[in-house]
Amino acid sequence: MMLDKDSVKAIDVQTASLQSYISSPEKQKSLYKRTLFVVSISQIFGGAGLAAGVTVGALIAQQMLGTDAFAGLPSALFTLGSAGSALIVGRLSQRYGRRTGLSAGFMIGGLGAIGVIMAAIINSIFLLFISLLIYGAGTATNLQARYAGTDLANHKQRATAVSITMVFTTFGAVAGPSLVNVMGDFALSIGVPSLAGPFILAAAAYMLAGVVLFIMLRPDPLVIARTIEAANEEPGDKGHLAATEHTENKKGIIVGATVMVLTQIVMVAIMTMTPVHMRHHGHDLGAVGLVIGFHIGAMYLPSLVTGVLVDRLGRTAMAISSGTTLLLAGVIAAFAPGESMILLVIALSLLGLGWNFGLISGTALIVDSTDTATRAKTQGTVDVLIALSGAAGGALSGMIVAGSSYLALSLIGGILSLLLIPVVVWSRGR
């Protein structure tokens, strides 16, 4: 196929632009900062879309079906949707760059939210469940966006870059639920069921996140990182050395994934059953909300400090800290009197903090252990495992409490978190 002069000129300009970053550390640094800014802005919208929808998903299903029996299905559906979407967003990002993968993921999540609104209007449970599955794409993209800021970061900046995007997610995640009543009133004013109101916010927020990334994430950080890495490759004997590096990279991926999967299982399991445990001991919804609020705050707000610690003290030290913190959380939750608000707040705050340590150190390990040729695809695969482990943790937690007790669940979770230590120690061996 022949290209016209304008097409050839455009390709030449793009190539020259990419090449300019190879020889200019200042331009690389500037793009790194710009990428962090753009991703952080998108995460504010993404967090709002995630939290607003999650808040009322179960209530919409309950209202449509007239029973509590399937109220947990919305959470399961968008978790499954998130798992599948994580794989797709990772593949798209690997092939076309972060800009395409992330913007597409958020926009698809927005379409899912619109589908939920339509389902509420026409009272279609089938459309609701399909739409919730699609809505899960926003959840997956919100999580994967944390990787975009690391593409141009050096080894000592990667955890800090992840932590910055997580803090900005908090702003949206806090704003979303606080606007539930406002959006419910707005929905009624335009003839939409009030419970669909938060999904109006979710649709707008996810679409805005996608637009911000599509317009502003230029040049694409993963494409630039790939160009720089290719330019810096030196020809030579890659036989034994390459095989050794591949083994080490594979080990790092296994450890990073294990850290995040285990922390996700433990966190989701204990968090899911804590409100039920509290209600059984006479706490009202306000008290439950307070404990969960402290928990969510501890999951995200310490991120900036955690990122600095992971970069300075090392991934291994903070992964071990994650395991010990989760153990402490499990022990306190297990033996705290059911009537003690203070001890439950402490336990759930430590649970959130341990998860924070694990996610940031595990993410940094994944980034350290991959190159630009496979990074986005590998990250997407790991996020599938995280999503599925969260779903498994939530499902198993109810079974354990039903078959035994909240005490047993908390102790099992705490002990399970200790598996992080031998896994991390193994990773240090040759």
Curated annotation (Swiss-Prot):
It is a multi-pass membrane protein. GO terms for molecular function: transmembrane transporter activity. Keywords: Cell membrane, Membrane, Transmembrane, Transmembrane helix, Transport. It is found in: Cell membrane. PROSITE patterns: MFS (PS50850). Signal peptide: none annotated. GO terms for cellular component: plasma membrane. It comes from the Bacteria. The chain crosses the membrane at residues 36-56, 69-89, 100-122, 126-148, 160-180, 197-217, 253-273, 285-305, 317-337, 340-360, 384-404, 406-426. Disulfide bonds: none annotated. The keyword Nucleus does not apply. InterPro entries: MFS (IPR011701), MFS_dom (IPR020846), MFS_trans_sf (IPR036259). The keyword Transmembrane applies. Belongs to the major facilitator superfamily. This is Uncharacterized MFS-type transporter YdeG. It comes from Bacillus subtilis (strain 168). The gene is ydeG.
